[in-house]
Amino acid sequence: MHGDDVDRTAFVPRRLPAEAAYVDSQVDLAANRQPHCVTCFERLLVQEKDENRRRLWASGKACATSEESCAGGPTLAPGHSGP
């Protein structure tokens, strides 16, 4: 594959300001519920390309299963808030 063919924005969710604020508030709620959740939440939110699954993560409903989803997977460094 040629470098020119790579879509560098493929893994970056495009959010409207209102949606970004909503997602941020859900990240805060998730942090209060389950401190381990935010790292996986942010990592998967950025990587998730499917809109419906991304919205499920944004709602925090998938947070309860993040331990299984993220166990052993790479995580963001402590204090890293994502892009």
Curated annotation (Swiss-Prot):
Q: Where is this region: Disordered?
A: 61-83
Q: Which keywords are on file for this protein?
A: Crown gall tumor, Plasmid, Virulence
> What is the protein named?
VirE locus 9 kDa virulence protein
Which organism is the protein's source? Agrobacterium fabrum (strain C58 / ATCC 33970)
